[in-house]
């Protein structure tokens, strides 16, 4: 997904870079130290170029023994100074660059946590990972590494030009006639690098997304013998990425060749004009050698300044992608009403909602009441709007019209953090995080609870049997996404987490749909201990699990078309009765 805000889409490269530099402000003293080091490097290099005159005249022409003795020592001292200055520059710049990359990663992840749910529907996780990974690194390169090259090489060029002007301003000014051509080449190269860099970052995200999709679903890929088709898909995207990379290399090579050609033209002009000046007696052999050495030193510096455009423009392209996230509007959080512990009285009043880019509403005029201490089951065919309805309660999405009230007040009146503290969620796909069982139960704001509380909820969630059998018990590492545990075990840990939170509102999103009979029995038993004295909303796939619900809402195409108890709805012989009979292969009587 190409997500660029309108402001950033039209931001000039200089404006973007200037904004990038604001992130370096915190590390300005490191940059000052680095600049001093770069200046010392340039002075040492320029002094060496200036010494070419006495080396030539005094050593080879005048044969001055005294000068021949101290000049080698002076050159060693200059390069020692240059090496120390270079080390200081590299260390200071490197520390600043890595710090800025870290700051960007933290800022962008923090921002993602504040974005509305629609953002996560519209942008693949792979694209987010590219922003947090390579984009942040490219930005550090642009802010610091590119700056280091530009400062170092610019100072080297300036130093060499000062030496050249000192020995012959006429020759130097004549050579500077090629400067406009050089500036034109660098401007064209920068523009092309910037355009290609945008495409490369998007291509990297698509590559990561394709690999993540194939590897995450490796079992389906193998069972359906889809390896070849997935490889073809990945190879096609990799070829696009390769083509873009070749364009970058082509641009770099052509620009380097152009700079070298212009340098050769300048060198030829130097030979021509310097020869004329020497014949007129205005240029000594030492002057000529200093001019020639300085000109030769300028050419690689100019080449590096041209090549740094790739790093700089890639960083600017990455910065625009990062700023498109940082400039996105946060989810609405304007409530001011204090909320300690809610009673849990939920009321939907004429709620209509639709997803961005879709014309048909996902919910259409939905109204119902869920009282504290009751269980409200929500059933219906796939795509009827059950999960969309549930997602409105924690305000992952905002309705288009209507109101949702908690304890008589609109949800928007409460702070988001306070509202979400009232809700515990147990879904079908339980997400555990890489860490211990104890850390996954006492998750988030609950991480300071005592171990006795964790042990209590493990017992209540019917998880003690398998936890006690694990080598480290509660300290057992569950692996990435809880991969070292079974589905039923992960589900019981999710219930333990909800028990520990002790929130007045409980949302169960098909919590037993994917479990075997034994695991379902254990989970259902744990849920029976979790649900009392809470407002419980259950999305149910297996209708046999909601027979004792206080009310059942039957949804179809975003509307509630039936409501009542299990017995009442069976007696009506409507959609609920049909769905129930389909599960048990017979019409109820």
Curated annotation (Swiss-Prot):
Record-annotated ABC transmembrane type-1 domain positions: 32-314
Pfam families assigned to the protein according to its UniProt record, in alphabetical order: ABC_membrane, ABC_tran
Main location per the UniProt record: membrane
Coiled-coil segments: none
Role description: Involved in lipopolysaccharide (LPS) biosynthesis. Translocates lipid A-core from the inner to the outer leaflet of the inner membrane. Transmembrane domains (TMD) form a pore in the inner membrane and the ATP-binding domain (NBD) is responsible for energy generation.
Binding-site residues for ATP, renumbered to this chain: 380-387
Domain of life: Bacteria
NCBIfam families linked: MsbA_lipidA
The protein, known as: ATP-dependent lipid A-core flippase
Domain ABC transporter as annotated: residue spans: 346-582
GO molecular function terms listed in the Swiss-Prot or TrEMBL record: ABC-type oligopeptide transporter activity; ATP binding; ATP hydrolysis activity; ATPase-coupled lipid transmembrane transporter activity
Record comment regarding domains: In MsbA the ATP-binding domain (NBD) and the transmembrane domain (TMD) are fused.
Quaternary structure note: Homodimer.
Family: Belongs to the ABC transporter superfamily. Lipid exporter (TC 3.A.1.106) family.
A cellular-component GO term for this protein: plasma membrane
Major enzyme class: translocase
SMART domains from the UniProt entry: AAA (SM00382)
Catalytic activity as recorded in UniProt: ATP + H2O + lipid A-core oligosaccharideSide 1 = ADP + phosphate + lipid A-core oligosaccharideSide 2
Transmembrane segments: 29-49, 68-88, 157-177, 254-274, 283-303
E.C. designation(s): 7.5.2.6
Membrane topology: Multi-pass membrane protein
Subcellular location: Cell inner membrane
Keywords tagged on the record: ATP-binding, Cell inner membrane, Cell membrane, Lipid transport, Membrane, Nucleotide-binding, Translocase, Transmembrane, Transmembrane helix, Transport
């Amino acid at each position: 997904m190409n997500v660029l805000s309108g402001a950033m889409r039209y931001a000039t490269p200089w404006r973007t870079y200037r904004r990038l530099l604001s992130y370096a402000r915190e590390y300005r003293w490191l940059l000052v130290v680095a600049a001093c080091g770069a200046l010392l490097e340039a002075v040492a290099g320029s002094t060496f170029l200036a010494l070419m005159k006495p080396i030539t005249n005094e050593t080879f022409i005048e044969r001055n023994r005294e000068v021949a003795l101290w000049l080698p020592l002076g050159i060693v001292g200059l390069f020692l100074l240059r090496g120390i200055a270079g080390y200081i520059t590299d260390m200071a710049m490197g520390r600043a660059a890595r710090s800025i990359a870290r700051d960007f990663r933290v800022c962008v992840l923090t921002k993602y946590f504040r974005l509305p749910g629609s953002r996560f529907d519209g942008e693949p996780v792979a694209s987010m990972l590219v922003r947090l990974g390579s984009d942040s690194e490219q930005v550090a390169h642009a802010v610091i590494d590119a700056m280091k090259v530009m400062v170092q090489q610019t100072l080297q060029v300036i130093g060499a030009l000062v030496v050249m002007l000192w020995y012959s301003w006429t020759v130097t000014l004549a050579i500077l006639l090629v400067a406009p051509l050089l500036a034109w080449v660098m401007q064209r190269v920068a523009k092309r690098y910037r355009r290609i860099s945008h495409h490369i970052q998007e291509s990297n995200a698509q590559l990561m997304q394709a690999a993540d999709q194939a590897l995450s679903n490796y079992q389906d890929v193998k069972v359906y013998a889809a390896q070849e088709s997935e490889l073809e898909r990945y190879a096609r995207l990799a070829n696009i990425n390769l083509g873009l990379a070749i364009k970058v290399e082509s641009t770099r090579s052509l620009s380097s060749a152009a700079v070298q050609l212009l340098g050769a033209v300048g060198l030829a002009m130097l030979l021509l004009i310097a020869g004329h000046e020497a014949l007129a007696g205005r240029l000594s052999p030492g002057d000529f050698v200093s001019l020639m050495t300085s000109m030769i030193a300028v050419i690689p510096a100019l080449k590096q300044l041209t090549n740094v455009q790739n790093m700089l423009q890639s960083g600017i392209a990455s910065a625009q992608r990062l700023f498109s996230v940082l400039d996105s509007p946060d989810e609405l959080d304007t409530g001011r009403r204090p909320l300690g512990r809610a009673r849990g009285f939920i009321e939907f009043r004429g709620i209509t909602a639709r997803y961005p880019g879709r014309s048909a509403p996902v919910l259409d005029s939905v109204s119902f009441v869920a009282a504290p201490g009751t269980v409200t089951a929500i059933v219906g065919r796939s795509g009827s709007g059950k999960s969309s309805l549930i997602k409105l309660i924690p305000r992952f999405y905002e309705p288009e019209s209507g109101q949702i009230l908690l304890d008589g007040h609109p949800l928007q009146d409460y702070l988001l953090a306070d509202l979400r503290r009232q809700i515990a969620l147990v879904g079908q796909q339980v997400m555990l995080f890489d860490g211990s069982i104890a850390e996954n139960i006492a998750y988030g704001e609950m991480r300071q609870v005592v171990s006795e509380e964790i042990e209590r909820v493990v017992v209540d969630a019917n998880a003690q049997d398998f936890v006690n059998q694990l080598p480290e018990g509660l300290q057992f590492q569950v692996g990435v996404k809880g991969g070292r545990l079974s589905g039923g075990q992960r589900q019981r840990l999710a219930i333990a987490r909800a028990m520990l939170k002790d929130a007045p509102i409980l949302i169960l999103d098909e919590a037993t749909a994917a479990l075997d009979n034994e695991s379902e029995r254990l989970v259902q038993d744990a849920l029976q201990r979790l649900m009392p004295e809470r407002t419980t909303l259950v999305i149910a796939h297996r209708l046999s699990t909601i027979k004792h619900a206080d009310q059942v809402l039957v949804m179809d195409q975003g509307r509630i078309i039936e409501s009542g108890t299990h017995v009442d709805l069976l007696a009506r012989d409507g959609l609920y009765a049909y769905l129930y009979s389909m599960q048990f292969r017979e019409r109820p009587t």
